[in-house]
A protein has these predicted regions:
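Sec-dependent N-terminal signal peptides
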Residues: 3-13
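Cyclophilin-like peptidyl-prolyl cis-trans isomerases
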Residues: 11, 15-172
Length: 172
């Protein structure tokens, strides 16, 4: 009985969250499929921030070729940002959900249970991140745009020399 109730609850929770989020960036459009069945709080947070226009105009402040691109910090320093909950929220790990391919969308953090508004998109498999960052979606369109962003010239701190921005983020 408890399993049935949990399955019904997760199904209802999933229905409340948009299945796709679109980023119009300086390099083109990226579409993400969210996975609320894997990370309901992270998806709710991401969708809530998108609905508020939080990501509009924010830059990808950290780009490491052969690893990932990171954004979601309104200060552009890698130290800012806040969740819709007004405080950091807990990690959501599933043993069978792994960083096994490029295009994984995950929460950036400063350690355990410190998720806020920052996220990253992998450009290669990154198994060393399993159990360290909450995976909550993946790129379903625009991996070519992710590749363009990945290849932007950066400085010694992995910051793009020319600003790379999320012009507009919205639910599909």
């Amino acid at each position: 009985m408890k399993k049935v109730v949990l399955v019904l609850f997760l199904g209802m929770w999933s229905a409340l969250i948009a299945s796709e989020v679109v980023f119009e960036t300086t390099q083109g459009t990226i579409v993400f499929a969210l996975k609320p069945e894997v990370a309901p709080k992270a998806c709710e947070n991401f969708e809530g921030l998108v609905k508020k226009g939080y990501y509009n105009g924010i830059s990808f402040h950290r780009i490491i070729k052969g690893f990932m691109i990171q954004g979601g910090d309104p200060t552009g320093t890698g130290r800012g940002g806040e969740s819709i909950y007004g405080k950091p929220f807990e990690d959501e790990f599933k043993p069978n959900i792994m960083f096994s391919k490029p295009g994984i969308l995950a929460m950036a953090n400063a350690g355990r249970n410190t998720n806020g508004s920052q996220f990253f998109i992998t450009t290669v498999p990154t198994p060393h991140l399993n159990g360290r960052h909450t995976i909550f979606g993946e790129v379903v369109e625009g991996m070519d745009v992710v590749r363009k962003l990945e290849n932007i010239v950066t400085d010694g701190r992995d910051m793009p020399m020319q600003p790379q921005k999320i012009i507009k983020a919205y639910l599909k």
